[in-house]
Design a protein with these regions (language model features):
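Alpha/beta-hydrolase fold catalytic core
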Residues: 1-24, 45-48, 87-89, 245-248, ...
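Active-site loop/oxyanion-hole signature of alpha/beta-hydrolase fold enzymes
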Residues: 6-9, 16-18, 52-94, 125, ...
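Helix-rich cap/lid subdomain of alpha/beta-hydrolase
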Residues: 130-184, 190-191
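Conserved serine/cysteine hydrolase catalytic core
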Residues: 189-242, 251
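Conserved HGGG/HGGXW glycine-rich cap/lid loop of the alpha/beta-hydrolase fold
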Residues: 16-60
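Conserved catalytic-core motifs of eukaryotic protein kinase domains, centered on the activation segment
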Residues: 36-38, 61-67, 130-131, 234-235
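Catalytic histidine-centered segment of alpha/beta-hydrolase-like enzymes
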Residues: 255-264
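Conserved hydrolase catalytic core segment
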Residues: 88-130
Length: 280
């Protein structure tokens, strides 16, 4: 756990650093934590200094009470984290929620560090093609959302998350339970899930800024995509190939929304092929 100053407030942030070599920053998705990278980290750490952390409100990081969570604040947190660790040229691997934050960092073109390469996994790259789950939509409805948030127990959490995994690689309930408990631990109320979901309308409201950043950036981009994803799968991959015929896109035909959890060995190998210097 380290302490960072984010927007003038002191925040306790869970960070895990392993391995040696060029810096590789891992940015997790909703509704999980940095633990979702656990199966990949040992292999990645053979070639990289791997930095995995929990966003504000997630996992073991601080969950401030009555807080209005924002992808822009999370980007501020990443900037503060890299400054604290004195990392100036990381490669970034980002998934889902983390990929939206990574896109904001690309849009900022910050001067304090340079993203060497950005490897993005399934996320709402094109807002118009993003398909949130029904329970997510309902959770965002005033009144109903608060009731649903309070009703979200471990069983419902596991069932809802499991719906976005492929039939070939189903969600392990024991792993999902760990993420559920991490989300609840330290939360000042039972509606943390609802508060964090604010990223969906925030992403939609900033669609032009974020999509323009991806279309115009000079940062090298790679995409690792689970094609069985009902949220942000084949339709987004198809649109990506249409927009960028020369795109570096790896398609996992048998994986759903979470390819790094469903096929960690393949995803780790594909990350290393793009981020680690070739061995002599």
């Amino acid at each position: 756990m380290i302490e960072l100053i984010v927007r003038g407030a002191r925040r306790r942030v869970f960070v895990r650093v392993s391995g040696s070599g060029p810096a590789l920053l891992l940015m997790h998705g909703f509704p999980a934590s940095s633990f979702e990278w656990a199966e990949l980290e040992p292999e990645l750490a053979r070639r990289h200094t791997v930095v995995a952390f929990d966003f504000l409100g997630y996992g073991a990081t601080e969950k401030p009470a009555d807080h209005r969570y924002s992808i822009f604040e999370q980007a501020d947190l990443v900037e503060a984290l890299l400054a604290k660790l004195e990392i100036q040229d990381p490669s970034v691997v980002a998934y889902d929620y983390g990929a939206i934050v990574a896109t904001e960092l690309v849009a900022r073109a910050v001067k304090t560090f340079t993203i060497t390469r950005c490897v993005l996994l399934n996320h709402g790259l094109y807002a118009r093609l993003y398909r949130p789950r029904p329970i997510q939509k309902l959770t965002l409805v005033p009144g109903i959302g608060r009731l649903l948030a309070y009703a979200l127990n471990e069983r419902l959490f596991i069932r809802s998350w499991g719906e976005v995994f492929s039939d070939s690689h189903p969600l392990d309930p024991a792993v999902a339970a760990l993420h559920y408990r991490a989300l609840r631990t330290g939360a000042p109320g039972r509606d943390i899930h609802r508060r964090l979901l604010r990223y969906i309308p925030e992403r939609a409201a900033n669609r032009e800024r974020l999509e323009t950043a991806m279309a115009t950036t000079e940062v090298p981009l790679s995409f690792l995509w689970g094609m069985q994803d009902p949220v942000s799968g084949a339709a987004i991959a198809t649109e990506l190939r249409r927009d960028r015929p020369d795109v570096d896109l790896v398609e996992y035909a048998d994986a759903g929304h979470c390819p790094h959890i469903e096929a960690p060995d393949r995803v780790a190998a594909d990350i290393i092929a793009r981020t680690a210097p070739a061995r002599p």
